Amino acid sequence: MAESENRKELSESSQEEAGNQIMVEGLGEHLERGEDAAAGLGDDGKCGEEAAAGLGEEGENGEDTAAGSGEDGKKGGDTDEDSEADRPKGLIGYVLDTDFVESLPVKVKYRVLALKKLQTRAANLESKFLREFHDIERKFAEMYQPLLEKRRQIINAIYEPTEEECEYKSDSEDCDDEEMCHEEMYGNEEGMVHEYVDEDDGYEDYYYDYAVEEEEEEEEEDDIEATGEENKEEEDPKGIPDFWLTVLKNVDTLTPLIKKYDEPILKLLTDIKVKLSDPGEPLSFTLEFHFKPNEYFKNELLTKTYVLKSKLAYYDPHPYRGTAIEYSTGCEIDWNEGKNVTLKTIKKKQKHRIWGTIRTVTEDFPKDSFFNFFSPHGITSNGRDGNDDFLLGHNLRTYIIPRSVLFFSGDALESQQEGVVREVNDAIYDKIIYDNWMAAIEEVKACCKNLEALVEDIDR
């Protein structure tokens, strides 16, 4: 009995010493925790053998301890194999455990750290590329300025385009090179009519010169145009009225933001520009809304600045996503008294409890308006409001402002509608396929029920 008790005490003390040794080594180095854990589990029975060698007094007791620890190591190895069988689920779309990397072997963890270092270097190169790309954008923005300035002058009736500048071929008038060569070969002289049918058909008499006839009609209408010329000059508006208001209202994401009381102010827009940050400054772009002098606010320029993420965070460089917007800031609008469309003023009458005197108190409450877009309070990427604001700023910079005439004329809307129609057709097609599959499944179920009924009849 005494000998068995001594053997039990020796085995317990050896296991305790081995566990303490593992804990000390684990606190020493973070990356060697996997080795210590593996040694603690005793995959090869090494912990038991080291503990038995440390005792060195009773070989048989040491062998028993080593054997016991070896069995524990086998059990631990079995549990590791079971957990490894479950790990691939995380790679198929399931949420990975936070200690997934910690559970990997030490050599594998070293390789993962090497890959992370490579990823950091790649992100540094990407950030450098984006900064240089921003410089190229700035260079071409200067080349665009003459075109954008002429657009502003035409919209605001500062410049009247010539007839040559107004010549624009629509899609129906476009022709390819083969058709142009065909016209050059067969001639296209004024007053000359081409005969595209055989002479024996007798249809030549029906062809006449439309150009000559139009000239005759124009001569007959010269008197009418001369009499109404003065009235037309008075009726013709200057420039393109409500250009920017129409553009903004034709944008799906902006339409819900524009209220009736915003439209009179947006009619005063003379131009919307995109200004990129100067060299050496943090990457950003500013949307500039230029207004005519008006009765609503004293500002003639309202701005919204979007700061881009162009550098890696020292504490965590891996979530880098390119030129994502970090935050945005608006400007302070100097509203004239009683003209602030972003606030709703309510007057209340209050009666004094003791004296009975009545006083009028006014309270301001925020209300929906397009001009909340210029809120001076910074908006970060946290939250849904930030994502919506960043998407709107990106669309204004990239699509709406450079292609404003397409949104004014509705050409951009047609492309948007085509995309919507395509999505609807795809949804309808998917619904038809789904219905067909469900009908086939119901038929299979009915056949199964019939087979079950036949089997029951046979059994009877």
Curated annotation (Swiss-Prot):
Residues 1-88, 214-238 are annotated as: Disordered. GO terms for molecular function: chromatin binding; histone acetyltransferase regulator activity; histone binding. It comes from the Eukaryota. Residues 1-11, 27-36 have a biased composition (Basic and acidic residues). GO terms for biological process: neuron differentiation; nucleosome assembly; positive regulation of neuron differentiation; regulation of stem cell division. It is found in: Nucleus. Keywords: Nucleus. The keyword Nucleus applies. A motif (Nuclear localization signal) lies at residues 346-352. Residues 214-236 have a biased composition (Acidic residues). GO terms for cellular component: chromatin; nucleus. Acidic protein which may be involved in interactions with other proteins or DNA. PANTHER family: TESTIS-SPECIFIC Y-ENCODED PROTEIN (PTHR11875). Belongs to the nucleosome assembly protein (NAP) family. This is Nucleosome assembly protein 1-like 2. The gene is NAP1L2.
